[in-house]
Amino acid sequence: MAGLTFLRVVNNDQIARQEKESSDKALAERQNQPVILGLVGYLRNCWDVAQMAKRPIEQEMLKALRQRNGEYEADKVRQIRNQGGSEIYMMVTEVKCRAAESWLRDIMLDNGSPPWDLEASPIPELSPTQTKEVQGIFAERVLKLVQEYGKAPSPDEMEEIKEMVGQDYRFYILRAAQTRADRMKVKIQDQFAQGGWELSFNDFITDLVTFPAAFIKGPVVRRQRTLGWKINSAGQTTVEATDVLGPEYERVDPFRIYPEPGVTTIEDGYLFEHHPMTRMKLSDLIGVPGYDEEAIRKVLDIGNGQSWINEDVELQKDEEERKFYAYMRPTEEFDALEFWGKVSGKMLIEWGLSEDEVPDAAREYDANVWVVGNYVIKAVLNYDPLGEKPYAKTSFIKAPGAFWGKGIPKIIEDLQGVCNAAARALVNNMGISSGPQVEVNLERIPPNEDITQLSPWKIWQVTNDPVGSSAPAIRFTQPDSRATELMAVYEKFSRLADDHSGIPAYVYGDLNVQGAGRTSSGLSMLMGAAGKGIRQVVMYIDTDIVKPVVLRQFVYNMRYVEDESIKGDVVVLAKGAINLAVKETVNIRRIEFLNATANPVDMEIIGKDGRAAILREVAKGLQMPVDEVVPSREKSGYQGRVQSRAAAAAQQQQAPADTPELPNGAPKGGMEANTVQNRTSGRAA
């Protein structure tokens, strides 16, 4: 019929399907754009080179795990079994690693105070505003002296007053700055406690002594699930789970770090981190700012069939970590790669970053890109003020110019092999020499006689020697025991492992110490000498881990925390090497100093504030509640002001009242007046 039009009616399912098809098509078109393919291709090239360069390091790390677990390499097992005999493995490496871990944890974690501190930055010169304030204080001080003495101070006195005013002002500023630094320290300690610093650092120490390098990542802002408490309408306390954003820290598995080939430090080139993510973790990124929701949904639909990871290394690592049959777990995992490095501005603009963030398309920008398979799920700039990556790295022994260093398993690898060989030979020799070797003349043994079993009081049936020889039919030969020589070899090379690793046996409780170690003072000297080796490792931790991580957390607080009372210029001090000194000795010296200064002369010099500062350090060393034992500087100052006001008020109340006087200036009548008058005239009352 002419002029009629038809309206097509579709249901909600059809509309949803059409929208999904349109969204998938748009995503495919965007991901297939040359720039996106270029970004993925660039990352793939970087990844392939980094993965290839790390293969020797991966084999070294797998060997270190086997060495700690007491397992031979596959080729060594074949050689031993071809020869026959014992497959015993002496756990020298494991003992040294555990001793080193315990020693480092005792130095860095078990001191009652963090292995770092914050101090206010020294002020070399005053700003113009502060100089004006000093001049004003100086003028007031001079005016007061003129009013008191009726004359101006001499030029030398003026210069001395000016210097004193400047020093007092600088001291006041430093005290205020140190108060801010102390508040910042408390804030960072709380953030470390909430962000998992201690647990991460504990795992980091295990990596440090085992692998060629160890890593810590942070601060990384994540959503934290915490418990809160509130009072309901009935006055009862109820629990409430809340989500808050906060900085977190984590130990990064060295197997999952892939640096750019040829670099020495993390900041020298790009870096990949491998994130195995379950479907739930990946889906939780939907809606998070910076992530591409459509790309994530597409990856979830496709699955993890486009992984770039070498599964052989993953399987071997899982077996060494006792994660048997991990490949059979029903939970699907996606291999996400986090890239930190330079990316061209053109790629970032085409991805979706604004021109305000990327003003020049021709420049290279520090970026953070996440890729799963062939899909980029995140591409943002690195917003660190210095463009640094959120990683820190160090090694047990560092090699100049190399990214990867050495761990204890690598250091004593040869010595572990010799100890194993000596132990295998010892066990084999003990087995052979434990009984006699039996020689039997079969021509003189009856056919039904069992010659494979020996027992006490066994009777052997034999025949005469056909040739008339007088030699016995059965002869016993006792093999020699070489246990003494083999034990000497083992002990020699195990002692060499002490020297090479820097972890002597007496550090972890071996009482069989010869020479100077037999006395307490001699053992103390040996412990001090052994500490020189571990001190170098502690210095690496101080400079490469503790100081940069604390500094990054400080910068984060300066940028994002709203509390202005904690903000100020500070210097981060790492104290791990200082903590290596004997803590008891340091505290004893502090107590001796307190006793030596407990006299009026020294108290006038150091004052109550100085003595309180020493008491605080002594209380910290004794792991006492410092704030409950010694008042803080603020509280002590407040108490001093209150006491001063109370003393002034008491003196004012005790001051004698003015005596009433007559017009001629004499006291008014009465007994007291007469007494005063008589005293004035010199006569007795």
Q: Which residues are covered by each model-predicted region?
A:
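Extended, charged amphipathic alpha-helical segments
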Residues: 326-328, 337-517
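Long, highly charged low-complexity segments enriched in Glu/Asp and Lys/Arg with interspersed Ser/Thr
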Residues: 607-650
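Extended amphipathic alpha-helical segments with heptad-repeat/coiled-coil character used for oligomerization
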Residues: 217-220, 231, 518-617
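Conserved structured core elements
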Residues: 178, 182, 198, 406-409, ...
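Long, low-complexity, intrinsically disordered segments
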Residues: 661-685
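Extended, helix-rich architectural segments
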Residues: 1-366, 485, 491-492, 681-685
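Generic, well-ordered alpha-helical scaffold segments in large soluble proteins
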Residues: 187, 191-194, 219, 415-429, ...
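Short, glycine/acidic-rich hinge or "gate" loops at secondary-structure transitions
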Residues: 199-207, 225-226, 435-441, 505-520, ...
